[in-house]
Amino acid sequence: MAQNGSEAGPLVAGVAGRYASALFELARDERQVDAVAESLNQFDGLLKESADLRRLVRSPVFSAEEQEAAIGAVLDKAGIGGLAGNFIRLAASNRRLFALPDMIDAFRALVQDSKGIVRAQVRVAERPSDAVIEEIKASLRDIAKADVDVDLVVDPSLIGGLVVKMGSRMVDASLKTKLNGIRLAMRAAR
């Protein structure tokens, strides 16, 4: 049983799940889980910053050789080596770069599960103060009875309030949803 109370651990499926599970097991055996996670986070940051790198990763137009050469250059320049660098190079040589963002997410889920950390996504209309963020984290920790890693997403379409997803649970306390509920009730009252 996983530390967070789930029996099966995080859901890691498909190509991304298989690659992430293999990397996690190897990193755990080599006692390099944190180093690999840090390197993958660094690469994920590069992906988020560079439209060209995202295009290289997602596009089937590039040959395997072109992808391998370009990824190798990016990894060398960023100083990403070891297990994480080899893993990314393997994904390139196997034409699986398109799944790399999902592989990184699946690896993170495995790491967090192994440490008893629960992931939560909190969508808000505008970025709250640090004090409010800490209150949200404390509330989620109390509910989960575990450490919680909060992914804060700003979504102006919510108008106000927040939407929290934690595991299989979701709480929608957004103003947008409340207004939609009022709108539906008024239509039904006609």
Curated annotation (Swiss-Prot):
F-type ATPases have 2 components, F(1) - the catalytic core - and F(0) - the membrane proton channel. F(1) has five subunits: alpha(3), beta(3), gamma(1), delta(1), epsilon(1). F(0) has three main subunits: a(1), b(2) and c(10-14). The alpha and beta chains form an alternating ring which encloses part of the gamma chain. F(1) is attached to F(0) by a central stalk formed by the gamma and epsilon chains, while a peripheral stalk is formed by the delta and b chains. The lineage of its organism: Bacteria, Pseudomonadati, Pseudomonadota, Alphaproteobacteria, Hyphomicrobiales. Belongs to the ATPase delta chain family. The keyword tRNA processing does not apply. The keyword Membrane applies. It is found in: Cell inner membrane. This is ATP synthase subunit delta. It holds the Pfam family OSCP. It comes from the Bacteria. Gene3D superfamilies: N-terminal domain of the delta subunit of the F1F0-ATP synthase.
